[in-house]
Regions:
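Residue-level recognition of short, solvent-exposed, well-ordered loop/turn junctions
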Residues: 25, 94-97, 130, 165, ...
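Glycine-rich beta-strand-centered segment in the early N-terminal region that forms part
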Residues: 22-36, 51-105, 138-140
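C-terminal hydrophobic helical "lid"/dimerization subdomain
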Residues: 245, 249-253, 293-354
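NAD(P)H dinucleotide-binding glycine-rich loop of Rossmann-like/cofactor-binding domains
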Residues: 62-71, 76, 99-173, 311
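Mid-domain Rossmann-like dinucleotide-binding core that forms the NAD(H)/NADP(H) cofactor-binding site
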Residues: 141-220
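Glycine-rich cofactor phosphate-binding loops and adjacent beta1-alpha1 units
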Residues: 162-165, 205-284, 347-354
């Protein structure tokens, strides 16, 4: 077999195409995709391709004159199986070993797997990773669980960036995968007051199960006032995990003095923000995006040790031909947390309960 199926995003649309199975280069490994989560950033790049590509061009990820019709082979939250090693590799893990990794290619200048034009992503049957970043998946950890390692690492990194005291009060805004990951990390860190804020009442139960001590519907109650009352002389720390642009200025206006705001949501459009309030109140505004390899490894260990109930985060699964339908579902209001793609099979979106 020399060809494989791959999901490509182009001009805001997804399609399944047949392409050649890639050949691993020096230091690289060919892997078979076993499970891959649909990330909010996959949705964002599909809906706002031009905005994302403008950022890529300004950061030097894409050429300045590159067109917006570039294909992206999506998929960066993965579990995979080692198929073949490229040259200049050690081959310490046997072929057939299940692995995951930080989704970048050091051998390609640190480019992101599944988000960068020209690279292979894990929505494909096969793709390329770096040997140096491989982590074996423990036998007791299902592949779909290991695919949730990446968003857990994003949440863990945000919490580490916050440098909270356990008596500080956390507000986690948005109870999607990153928000839940942050809640879980806060709980494991020992933070005593964790307020989950989400307008979808359906998110209340899972937020509490992941470790929130309180749930607030922000359309009905003031989560910032609730946190400030609990904090007393301690700090309020707001984790913006929703990616809703207007919320950033809103929290700058409402946050109490000396509060911290940790921004994990990706805002690609220009924002109208009045920083005078942040200056006068001496707010700490911290942006959090990626994570360290140690945080990724810790997230996999948290799954393996049962510290995080990953099953409750996984709400759907789909085969490679059903990915467009899954995206259509996620484009609209829905109750899904994390949909797992299994590129090795076909099949439409199915709901899964934890």
């Amino acid at each position: 077999m020399s060809q494989m199926n791959s999901v490509a995003m182009q001009n805001g649309k997804l399609h399944v195409k047949q392409i050649d199975i890639p050949t691993p280069g020096p230091g690289q490994v060919l892997v078979k995709s076993l499970a891959c989560g649909i990330c909010g950033s996959d949705i964002h790049i599909t809906r706002h391709t031009s905005d994302v590509f403008d950022i890529y061009k300004n950061l030097g990820i894409m050429a300045k004159d590159a067109g917006d019709d570039q294909e992206v082979l999506l998929g960066h939250e993965y579990a995979a199986e080692i198929i073949n090693y490229g040259p200049n590799t050690k081959g310490e893990l046997a072929k057939g070993t299940r692995v995951t990794s930080v989704p970048i290619l050091l051998s390609a200048g640190g480019a992101g797997v599944g988000v960068t034009p020209g690279l292979y992503g894990a929505y494909s049957e096969y793709f390329i990773v770096d040997e140096a970043l491989l982590l074996p998946i423990p036998d007791a950890v299902p592949s779909e669980a290991a695919a949730i390692t990446e968003p857990l690492a994003v949440g863990l990194h945000a919490v580490n960036r916050a440098q909270m005291d356990n008596d500080d009060v956390a507000i986690v805004v948005g109870c999607g995968p990153i928000g839940l990951a942050a809640i879980a990390a806060l709980k494991l860190q020992g933070v005593k007051h964790i307020i989950a804020s989400d307008p979808q009442e359906s998110k209340k139960q899972i937020a509490l199960e992941f470790g929130a001590t309180e749930y607030v519907n922000p359309t009905a109650d003031d989560e910032v006032a609730t946190a400030a009352a609990l904090a007393g002389s301690n700090k309020v720390v707001i984790f913006e995990c929703a990616g809703v642009s207007r919320l950033l200025n809103d929290y700058i206006l409402r946050a109490p003095a000396k509060a911290k705001i940790i921004v994990t949501g990706v805002h690609t459009a220009p924002l109208n923000v009045n920083f005078a309030y942040a200056t006068v109140k001496e707010l700490d505004l911290i942006f959090s995006y990626y994570y360290q390899p140690e945080e990724f490894a810790q997230s996999l260990e948290n799954i393996a040790s049962g510290k995080i109930a990953w099953q409750k985060m996984r709400t759907g699964k789909v085969g490679i031909d059903g990915v467009q339908g899954a995206f259509d579902t996620l484009f609209k209001p829905n109750d899904h947390i994390k949909i797992i793609i299994e590129p090795w099979r076909t099949g439409e979106l199915e709901k899964v309960t934890g």
